[in-house]
Every structure is written in C-alpha cells, then in structure tokens.
From Swiss-Prot:
The gene coding this protein: MFS
Lineage: Eukaryota, Fungi, Dikarya, Ascomycota, Pezizomycotina
Predominant localisation class: membrane
Keyword Manganese (UniProt): no
Naturally occurring in which organism (per UniProt): Leptosphaeria maculans (strain JN3 / isolate v23.1.3 / race Av1-4-5-6-7-8)
Membrane topology: Multi-pass membrane protein
GO molecular function: transmembrane transporter activity
Function summary: MFS-type transporter; part of the gene cluster that mediates the biosynthesis of phomenoic acid, a long chain aliphatic carboxylic acid that does not appear to be essential for pathogenicity but may play a role in allowing to outcompete other fungi in the environmental niche via its antifungal properties. Is probably involved in the efflux of phomenoic acid.
Protein name: Phomenoic acid biosynthesis cluster MFS-type transporter
Subcellular location: Cell membrane
Regulation: induction: Expression is positively regulated by the phomenoic acid biosynthesis cluster-specific transcription regulator C6TF.
Length: 628
C-alpha cells in the first residue's frame, strides 16, 4: 500500500513546490513574501508647509461655516509657494532640518521600534513556509492549505488603498498602533487556532495589520526626516525587510520541531517588549485635527475603496489557485478573471471621472499618469523588485532539490545576495542624497541584474555560448552547477538591485508637486508589491506547470492527488521511496524547470534597464548650500 496521501488536494501556487519534506523549506515562500503596500500616505516632510497652508485654509473656511475642502485659492497659494525664489526655498530647507522633535537616544529607540514592526511582518511572510505540513497534520485539513497563503495576501492587498487613505485623514500614531494591535491579535488567533477556519481568519487579519504597520513606518520616517536624511532612513526599511525574509524559514523550521504555534506567539513576545516605545515615543501627526470625525470621513472615497478591494481580491485568487486548485480553463478561474477585469475598468472610470468623490479625495493618483518621471519610477520599481525577489525565492529551492539542503543551509546559500543587496541599499541611501543623481543607480543596477539573471536562466543558445557550453540543450543552471558560479551571480544581482530596489520611495518625493506627496510613496508601494506578486506568480506558474508535467511522465502510476501531495511536501519523505535512478531523474526534472523561472527575473531586469534610459539627468536631494 502506498505511503503517500491520497486526498484530493487543492493547492495554491505555493504548495505545489515541495517534493519532500527535506526539500520544501523555501518552497512555500513563493507567496508568503508580499511586500506591503499602502496608498495616500499623509504629507511627507517636504510638503510640511503645504500641509499647514491647507490646514489654515480649511480652518478659515470652517469657521466661516463653509464646506471644509481645499479650495482652488488654497491650491493656487500652494503652487505659488512651491515656486518661491531660490532664497526662500533655501530658507525652508534650512528650517526643515529642525522639524523633528525627537533626537538622540529616544529617536534611536523610535527608529528601532518601527523597523522592528517591519521585521515582524517580513518574518510572518516567510515563517509559515516550514510549518505548513505541521498545521495540516494537526488540523487534518489538507484541502484548505492554499488559503493559508492566499488569505494572508488577500488580507493585505485588499486594504492597500483604503488603509492608505485613512492614514491621510486620521492620526498617524494611533492608526499605526491600531495596525500593530490588529497584527498582534491576528497572530494570537493563528497561534491558538482550534481548527483550520480560525487559522485562515487569523492569517487574513495578520495580512491587513501587517500592511498597516508598513505604511505607518514609511509615514513616520518620512514626516520626521528632512530631504537629506530621508533616503538613508527609508533604505533601512529594505534592509530590515530582507533580513526578516531570509530568517523566516530558518526560525519557522526551528519552531516546527518544538511547537509550530510559537511561530505566531513570537510576534506577541516582541510586540509586548516594543509596545511602550510605540505608545509613549511615537509623535502624533494629524493631517486634519481641527475637523470633526464626520468631516474627515466625508473625505474618504468609499466607492473607490469597495471597487479596489473587489478588484484586488478577484485578481489574486485566480493567479494563486489557477493551475493548482483549479485548471486555468475552468469556469471558476475564468469567472474570477472576468469579474476582476470588470472591477478594474469600473475603478478606472470612477477614479478618472471622480464619480462619488473629488480629485483631492480619490483613491488613486490619476495625475501621476501624466508625469513621465513618476511613471518611469513606477515601472522600474515593479520590474527591479521582480528581478531580485524571484531569485531570492528560487535559489534556495534549487539548493534544496539539487543539494538536499535544509532550512538553515539554504538560507546561508543566499548570504552573498542578501549581504550585497543590504550593503548597496545603505550605500545608495547615503550617496544618492549626497550627490543628488538617481538615474545612474537605475541604469547600472539594471545592467548588473540583467547579466546575473541571464546566467541563472536557461538561455538557448546565448548563455551556453557565454560559458562555452557546446550542448545548447544543457541549461546553465542544472543539478550539478558549481556553487561558485551561483554565488558570483548572486553577488552581482545584489550589487545591482540594491541601488534601486528601495530608492524609488525617496526619489518620487522630489519629482512630484508638494501637494501630491501624500500619493507619492504609496504609488511606489503599489509598484513594489505588484512587481513582486506578479513576478512570483508568473515564475511559479512556469516552474509548477513544467515540473508537474515532467513528474507525471516520470511517475505515471501516481494519481493526481498522490502527486500533488508529494509535490506539496505533505506526502511524507517521497524521494526516499524511489530507486536511485528515478530519484535522479525527478531531481533533474524539477531543477531544469526551476531554471526556466528565471526568465521572469531577467525580463524584469531588462524592462528596468530600458525604462531607466528615459530618466532625467537632473540632480535632486540638493544640499542647502547648493540650493542657495
């Protein structure tokens, strides 16, 4: 009797990656790393004067009994202020350096605490990768495993725009703390869940709370730093995110051996230690404190929120369940794509025509579509994140299948990439703000990322010629590829991506009007998470479909349910039941299909490289002396 599970298993993109338990560590990361996004961040530091102008105007109109809105007169005054003389601009820049009220050790604690929330969210994205089989065994609910990943993604993405808009009209401190509490409460639900349904609910709310923490962190760092310091501080977010992402599976694997529930309780322990800092040291920032709650909520685009939530949900579900839980041509997947298209069209019409909202209150910054620099930054952010995060996910999977690595070993294999990525992010934050140019970072980074991903991919015949292969049917990346080759390309990839993967958050704040800064950072967040989600979805689809078809040929006696159970990692130590020859063929089939996933990565790098050629050559982040 077969030792494999024989359940009819629906799997999301993520679960169909694990062939056996020892080879599954990073597989479930394919959908668990979804960098958070937000929308409509409150006015960042450079718009501080415009914000007060807007508040003063609103206060005057409110006291006169008029409708509290930003009038055309206020917009005109704002434009005049943004075109002041160079001397006036220099004076504002000089005064802006002292806007922060927290300095010294309290400021250090504040930065560490908000960055720690990013670390927890990144950790929660990937820590679940190693505990999926344990959860399935405890709850005896293999059929619902896909929702552990999809629910987390839906919970976060669904509130992208609505939550970001709330940050623009409510007190930043308390909305951030509310997001922290929601994330912690959801972690408690996941840890104490009595069944799979409760676990899924906890994952959904954890995704929503985590994105709220990310948006709040970006806001707090932006409004409390000057133009000169902001790139350096925002680069720390990418650094912490990368560290948390890599450590997630390692920590998850450790808890699986003890009790998987502590993978969620860990958030509560760290959160309890940091909560006093969040509560007492976080500065309050209220964009419209003089307005009543009803007046503030009247600025919220409820129709846009409903449409965006529906559009995101119906887009994520078919991408994740297509080809695994359901066939791509099934009625369910087709219906979801159709509904998604209709909702996106409705959202576009509603936003462009400002139906049931106003130009100042709508969810999406439609005006950015006419800004060349903003659109190029959006494209580059989406493309470069896809180019770097696809390898971050698939390189560990490669080592698990080809070398039999576990959680710790496969994480160590990523160190060349992560170390160079984090180091370059920090260097970029310092040097870009010092010299003022951003175009070279994107251009050189695109070249490096393209070269690295091309050599990690199966290219016929280009890659074969470059490495003097004579057999064009042999991929550069196969089960016997030298580790030194891979480490070298990892380092090159990290060196290239680090210069631009996080830079867009700071750059876009210099290329849009001050009155639009509330939209600017969230605009890049949408590109970042969209690029990661789309890139991983496409790469995993290439890998999963190819690997599944190959294994069906090699293992024709296995039923679909048994094959899916083995691939997902819930079917036991499957490879150990195979003879040596079949085991080698299975590993080769998986690795060869995995190499094809890097096509998505080098395509993203190519798009980023081409888009970077259109950037302006002007200097930004000018020092006060230079501005004068």
């Amino acid at each position: 009797m077969s030792t494999l599970c024989a359940f009819p298993v629906p799997y999301s993109t993520i679960e169909v990656l694990n062939i056996v338990l020892p080879y599954r560590t990073y597989s479930a990361r394919l959908l668990y790393l979804h960098a958070p996004l937000g929308n409509h961040l409150p006015f960042c530091h450079r718009s501080y004067n415009v914000l007060h102008l807007r508040q003063d105007c609103d206060s005057h109109m409110y006291s006169a009994g008029n409708d509290v809105r930003l009038s055309q007169e206020a917009v005109t005054m704002s434009d005049q202020r943004s075109h002041d003389t160079t001397a006036d601009q220099s004076a504002r820049d000089a005064s802006s350096l002292d806007t922060r009220k927290i300095h010294g050790f309290p400021w250090f604690l504040l930065v560490i605490s908000v960055l720690s929330s990013i670390f927890l969210y990144a950790l929660d994205n990937t820590i679940v990768a190693d505990i999926i089989p344990a959860i399935a065994n405890d709850f005896s609910s293999i059929n619902d495993l896909g929702w552990l990943s999809v629910g987390f993604v839906i919970g976060g993405v669904a509130v992208i725009m609505p939550l970001g808009k709330l940050y623009g009209i409510l007190n930043t401190k308390w909305l951030y703390i509310t997001s922290v509490v929601l994330f912690m409460a959801a972690s408690a639900v996941c840890g104490a869940a009595p069944d799979m349904n409760a676990e899924i609910v906890g994952r959904v709310f954890a995704g929503a709370g985590g994105i709220g923490m990310y948006i709040g962190t970006m806001i707090l760092l932006s409004i409390n730093t000057s133009d000169q310091e902001r790139p350096a501080y925002l680069s720390l977010v990418g650094l912490v995110w990368g560290i948390g992402t890599v450590l997630g599976p390692v920590i998850g694997g450790s808890f699986e051996k003890v009790d998987w529930r502590w993978a969620f309780y860990l958030n509560l322990v760290i959160g309890a230690l940091l909560f006093p800092v969040w509560f007492f040291l976080l500065p309050s920032f209220h964009p419209a404190k003089h307005l009543s709650l009803n007046k503030r909520l009247s600025q919220f685009d409820f129709v846009g929120a409903i449409l965006s939530i529906g559009a995101f949900v119906t887009t994520i579900m078919p991408i994740n369940f297509g080809g695994t839980t359901y066939e791509w041509n099934s009625g369910t997947i087709i219906a979801l794509f159709v509904v998604s298209g209709v909702l996106w069209i409705a959202f576009a019409v509603q936003q462009s025509l400002t139906l049931f909202t106003t130009p100042a209150d709508r969810m999406f910054p439609v005006q950015f579509l006419k800004n060349k620099e903003a659109m190029l930054l959006f494209i580059c952010a989406a493309a470069i994140n896809s180019a770097v995060f696809v390898p971050i996910y698939f390189i560990p999977i490669y080592f698990q299948f080809s070398r039999g690595d576990g959680a710790l070993d496969s994480a160590i294999r990523l160190l060349p990439l992560i170390f160079l990525l984090c180091a370059t992010i920090l260097v970029n934050g310092k040097l870009m703000s010092r010299f003022g140019y951003y175009m070279p970072w994107y251009l050189v980074g695109g070249v490096f990322c393209l070269i690295a991903n091309v050599f990690l991919c199966e290219l016929h015949p280009v890659a074969a010629v470059l490495v003097r292969y004579t057999d064009y049917k042999t991929a550069l990346l196969d089960a016997t590829t030298s580790q030194s080759y891979i480490y070298g390309f990892e380092a090159l990839l990290g060196l290239g991506a680090g210069g631009s993967v996080q830079a867009g958050y700071a750059v876009i704040q210099t290329v849009v009007p001050a009155t639009d800064l509330g939209y600017a950072v969230s605009f890049i967040m949408i590109a970042q998470i969209g690029g990661i989600a789309l890139g991983l979805a496409c790469a995993s689809a290439v890998f999963i479909n190819g690997a599944t078809n190959s294994l069906r040929v090699l293992l024709p006696l296995l039923s679909d349910s048994e094959l899916q159970s083995a691939i997902s990692g819930t079917g036991g130590r499957f490879l150990e039941t195979l003879d040596d020859n079949t085991r080698v063929q299975v590993i080769d089939a998986v690795v060869n299909n995995l190499a094809k996933a890097f096509i998505v990565a080098y395509a993203g790098a190519a798009v980023s490289l081409v888009a970077s050629l259109g950037f302006s050559r002007k200097r930004v982040f000018l020092p006060t002396a230079a501005a004068a």
